[in-house]
Amino acid sequence: RGKFKEICERPDGSCRDFCLETEIHVGRCLNSRPCCLPLGHQPRIESTTPKKD
């Protein structure tokens, strides 16, 4: 595998310096920038929800 990209924990998220008002902060990218997910894609993420794999 080649170079490191700005990879978000969520596949449809995007890495930026700060999230827009229409986005939710969902995690961190490899370069420690926030990972932002546009609102409306899915319900608000609850930390109490167990993950199913």
From Swiss-Prot:
A Pfam family hit: Defensin_beta_2
Gene Ontology CC annotations of this record: extracellular region
Signal peptide interval: 1-2
Principal subcellular localization: secreted
Intrachain disulfide bonds: 8-35, 15-29, 19-36
Coiled-coil intervals, chain numbering: none
UniProt keyword terms in alphabetical order: Antibiotic, Antimicrobial, Defensin, Disulfide bond, Secreted, Signal
GO biological process annotation, one example: innate immune response
Subcellular location: Secreted
Protein family according to the UniProt entry: Belongs to the beta-defensin family.
Function field: Has antibacterial activity.
Name used for this protein in its record: Beta-defensin 108B
Originating gene: DEFB108B
